[in-house]
């Protein structure tokens, strides 16, 4: 078996699923008693979530509702980078949350280092926003997938193009 096998390690957030989770969270907020009369809102602007609420406590509750809905839709919550809470107009507070899509250089280096430290006979290289892993043996590639799932990475990773 001279042919090499490969797969890609990527980190993606499905925006339609995020939009569905936002809509479900807004629907729940509209019906919850503790949010009656409050100015709470969640919006998706390109690849950024904007959470607005009356105070910090309600903002945290808003985040909890959103995270619950994201988890139900299988959206990785590790890929959400919450910014600082800022005071907005009308006595409300706002928080922006950036959706991280793609593997940046630092995380790619961590992934490559983990693979090299494991001693598995595969090669890994960083391409654009993904890491390609190649090896002669498919069992080695599956071992790398298992290693990545166990690793405590700051982002959620998926595995695609297993050939």
Swiss-Prot record:
One of its GO terms (cellular component) is cytosol. This is Nucleotide-binding protein BPUM_1028. Nucleotide-binding protein. The keyword Nucleotide-binding applies. Gene3D superfamilies: 3.30.70.860, YajQ-like, domain 2 (3.30.70.990). Belongs to the YajQ family. GO terms for molecular function: nucleotide binding. InterPro entries: DUF520 (IPR007551), UPF0234-like_C (IPR035571), UPF0234_N (IPR035570), YajQ-like_sf (IPR036183). Keywords: Nucleotide-binding. The keyword Nucleotide-binding applies.
């Amino acid at each position: 078996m001279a042919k090499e096998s490969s797969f890609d390690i990527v980190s993606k957030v499905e925006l339609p699923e995020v939009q569905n989770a936002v809509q479900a969270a807004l629907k729940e907020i509209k019906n919850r008693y503790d949010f009656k009369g409050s100015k709470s809102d969640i919006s998706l602007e390109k690849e950024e979530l904007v959470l607005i609420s009356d105070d910090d406590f309600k903002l945290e509750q808003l985040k909890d509702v959103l995270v619950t809905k994201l988890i139900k839709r299988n959206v990785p919550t590790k890929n959400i980078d919450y910014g600082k809470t800022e005071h907005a107009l009308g006595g409300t507070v706002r928080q922006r949350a950036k959706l991280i899509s793609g593997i940046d250089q630092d995380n790619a280096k961590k992934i490559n280092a983990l693979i090299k430290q494991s001693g598995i006979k595969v090669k890994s290289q960083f391409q654009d926003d993904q890491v390609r892993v190649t090896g002669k043996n498919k069992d080695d590639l599956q071992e790398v997938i298992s290693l990545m799932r166990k690793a405590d990475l700051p982002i959620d990773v998926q595995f695609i193009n297993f050939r």
